[in-house]
From Swiss-Prot:
GO terms for cellular component: host cell nucleus. This is Protein UL95 homolog. Pfam families: Herpes_UL95. It comes from Human herpesvirus 8 type P (isolate GK18). Belongs to the herpesviridae UL95 family. Interacts with ORF24; this interaction may serve as a core scaffold for the assembly of the viral transcription initiation complex. Interacts with ORF66. Interacts with ORF18. Interacts with ORF23. Interacts with ORF31. Interacts with host EPAS1; this interaction stabilizes host EPAS1, ensuring its transcriptional activity. It is found in: Host nucleus. The keyword Iron does not apply. Keywords: Host nucleus.
């Protein structure tokens, strides 16, 4: 073997050493596992290490006919989500499911998911004066048929409370918006609430629930706390009508977008575990993402999600330069 290795390596000691080790390893394998490996020397000054990897002979149809597979116990979250989005088909039943606010997407306890905000949505979330958004919503809801069978039946005071009322601003002790802009930031609502004409029926149903959540137990004085562009008696009437609205399945935090971003940044900086929604500012918001990101596995879906951090000083500068902090 050594003479053969010297011949093949042409005197190169490194090649000779590798050749010897390779042949020795092949010999050890064939000796220790003779039923699996065999070493064969060929006439061309080389060795072949042959492994027995042939499958056992078994007729293809020797087993019993396979029964129809049962997938009823499989848990497929993405498929279930798709069925909810599509309303489980088309037609009247599908339309009812798609428009019924009780069928809004829910998340399991401990689930990590994305709260996506388009450019227009997160810009409105940072804007104090929402008169233009209020006009857009009222214009879309001017058809009385939209409010048929709904209470309250007066859209203007209801929407004014939701966007401009005294309980619709951040309650954090150290609100970043207030520190830098002089006034508490607007309470962060879900993204679709900043695009009322996208789905009017869904918008009005959620507006009822979110307003009930914010003002169902409000104890402040309306005249002193705010100056609505209409008689305050309309607000009192709306508040009294909201008592019959069930908002037990509704929750929004009493914090603004800047405070939400600060909390998300703090979790990443401390390498903590994020629970609940991950803020994702798309469009022009991507320019504020910093290099400090974190990945986390969702315990319910098994997905790995990227948690971004944002440049808060740059966002505050943008707010001031664009006048979003002007009442």
């Amino acid at each position: 073997m050594f003479a053969l290795s010297s011949l093949v390596s042409e005197g190169d000691p490194e090649v000779t050493s590798r050749y010897v080790k390779g042949v020795q390893l092949a010999l050890d394998l064939s000796e220790n596992t003779p039923g699996q490996f065999k070493l064969i020397e060929t006439p061309l000054n080389s060795f072949l290490l042959v492994s027995n990897v042939m499958p056992e002979v078994q007729p293809i149809c020797s087993g019993l006919p396979a029964l129809r597979p049962d997938f009823s116990n499989l848990h497929l979250p993405r498929l279930e989500k798709l069925q909810r989005v599509l309303g489980q088909g088309f037609g009247a039943a599908g339309e009812e499911i798609a428009l019924d606010p009780s069928h809004v997407e829910t998340h399991e306890k401990g689930q990590v998911f994305y709260n996506h905000y388009a450019t227009e949505e997160w810009t409105w979330a940072l804007t104090l004066n929402k008169d233009a958004l209020l006009r857009e919503a009222v214009d879309g809801l001017c058809d009385p048929g939209t409010w048929k069978g709904l209470l309250p039946d007066d859209p203007l005071p209801l929407l004014w409370l939701l966007f401009n009322g005294p309980a619709s601003f951040c309650r954090a002790d150290c609100c970043l918006y207030k520190q830098h802009c002089g006034y508490p930031g607007p309470v962060l609502l879900p993204g679709h609430m900043y695009a009322p004409k996208r789905d009017l029926l869904s918008f009005v149903n959620h507006a009822l629930k979110y307003t009930k959540f914010l003002y169902g137990d409000f104890s402040g004085t309306w005249a002193a706390a705010c100056r609505p562009p209409f008689a305050t008696s309309r607000i009192q009437r709306v508040v009294s009508q909201m008592k019959i609205i069930d908002a037990s399945d509704t929750y929004i935090s009493h914090t603004c977008l800047l405070c939400h971003i600060y909390q998300q940044n703090s979790i990443i900086a401390g390498q903590g575990t994020h629970v609940g929604g991950i803020l994702l500012l798309s469009g022009k918001g991507t320019q504020y993402i910093t290099g400090n990101v974190q990945t986390q596995r969702c315990p319910t879906t098994g997905d790995y999600l990227i948690i971004p951090s944002y440049d808060i000083p740059a966002i505050i500068t943008m707010i001031k330069e664009n006048g979003l902090n002007q009442l």
